[in-house]
């Protein structure tokens, strides 16, 4: 029986531009597998990698997108189009399922406003700080909040409008106005290309090398995008390989336990892991507490001194924190 050759997988450092744009080599592969793997990986990383994006915007005093803003050169539609392009570095440990985060600009300056002037309440890092937002002639003339969540693919304005209506009661805000839905492009991969090259055409046994290049928008590292794409394919193929369980429903079809949930517990201690109410989470974040290790040393008096934390919220946090400690005894 023919033995399979050892397959080597490496990053092509010669073609690496930075952590967000690089190339990988996989070799040797049996003839035909280069195109098979390359095509499957390319389609997956372009369509199925999760990230975060703005889904709603609140501008002070604005009820709809056709309202006129005084002392601002751009109209509301233009500002919305600029704001939906603000990108944040995606850290799965910060985003629990369906969690919502807020970033804001509260009119602290006049002149040209850029993405770097936006403050994230959750410590999210903006990856395109030079993105132009608007030109303001008066301090305080423009105030806005961005509402951010995680997802994948492209979500249109109409779908996000329904989502805004569903979660409007959960959105805490410091300004007056309506939450305006925008399109969300969650896909972090800008380009992905592959090439299958024969590497021993003179030999009776022809093998291939797969060159796979990938470029992201800066919200996720290129190697992480490729890794997640491979894991998504593996999760699907594992289901197809399980011929002993045909016609049975698989609750873990996308491999969520491996791809999403395990890293949150094993490699991170974000306060999102406590499953707190939105009010409690926002109060902790505004007080600059983002990790469980930051709050586990606090006393009840310390919690009660945190702004916007009432007795019920303090009790909730302490109970959830104790439950988390009990569940994770022996882990680390």
Swiss-Prot record:
<feature type="region of interest" description="Alpha N-terminal domain (alpha-NTD)">
    <location>
        <begin position="1"/>
        <end position="244"/>
    </location>
</feature>
<feature type="region of interest" description="Alpha C-terminal domain (alpha-CTD)">
    <location>
        <begin position="259"/>
        <end position="332"/>
    </location>
</feature>
<dbReference type="InterPro" id="IPR011262">
    <property type="entry name" value="DNA-dir_RNA_pol_insert"/>
</dbReference>
<keyword id="KW-0240">DNA-directed RNA polymerase</keyword>
<dbReference type="GO" id="GO:0046983">
    <property type="term" value="F:protein dimerization activity"/>
</dbReference>
<dbReference type="InterPro" id="IPR036603">
    <property type="entry name" value="RBP11-like"/>
</dbReference>
<dbReference type="Pfam" id="PF01193">
    <property type="entry name" value="RNA_pol_L"/>
</dbReference>
<keyword id="KW-0548">Nucleotidyltransferase</keyword>
<dbReference type="GO" id="GO:0003899">
    <property type="term" value="F:DNA-directed RNA polymerase activity"/>
</dbReference>
<dbReference type="GO" id="GO:0003677">
    <property type="term" value="F:DNA binding"/>
</dbReference>
<dbReference type="GO" id="GO:0005737">
    <property type="term" value="C:cytoplasm"/>
</dbReference>
<comment type="function">
    <text>DNA-dependent RNA polymerase catalyzes the transcription of DNA into RNA using the four ribonucleoside triphosphates as substrates.</text>
</comment>
<dbReference type="GO" id="GO:0000428">
    <property type="term" value="C:DNA-directed RNA polymerase complex"/>
</dbReference>
<dbReference type="Pfam" id="PF01000">
    <property type="entry name" value="RNA_pol_A_bac"/>
</dbReference>
<dbReference type="GO" id="GO:0006351">
    <property type="term" value="P:DNA-templated transcription"/>
</dbReference>
<dbReference type="InterPro" id="IPR036643">
    <property type="entry name" value="RNApol_insert_sf"/>
</dbReference>
<dbReference type="InterPro" id="IPR011773">
    <property type="entry name" value="DNA-dir_RpoA"/>
</dbReference>
<keyword id="KW-0808">Transferase</keyword>
<dbReference type="Pfam" id="PF03118">
    <property type="entry name" value="RNA_pol_A_CTD"/>
</dbReference>
<comment type="similarity">
    <text>Belongs to the RNA polymerase alpha chain family.</text>
</comment>
<comment type="subunit">
    <text>Homodimer. The RNAP catalytic core consists of 2 alpha, 1 beta, 1 beta' and 1 omega subunit. When a sigma factor is associated with the core the holoenzyme is formed, which can initiate transcription.</text>
</comment>
<dbReference type="InterPro" id="IPR011263">
    <property type="entry name" value="DNA-dir_RNA_pol_RpoA/D/Rpb3"/>
</dbReference>
<protein>
    <recommendedName>
        <fullName>DNA-directed RNA polymerase subunit alpha</fullName>
        <ecNumber>2.7.7.6</ecNumber>
    </recommendedName>
</protein>
<keyword id="KW-0804">Transcription</keyword>
<dbReference type="InterPro" id="IPR011260">
    <property type="entry name" value="RNAP_asu_C"/>
</dbReference>
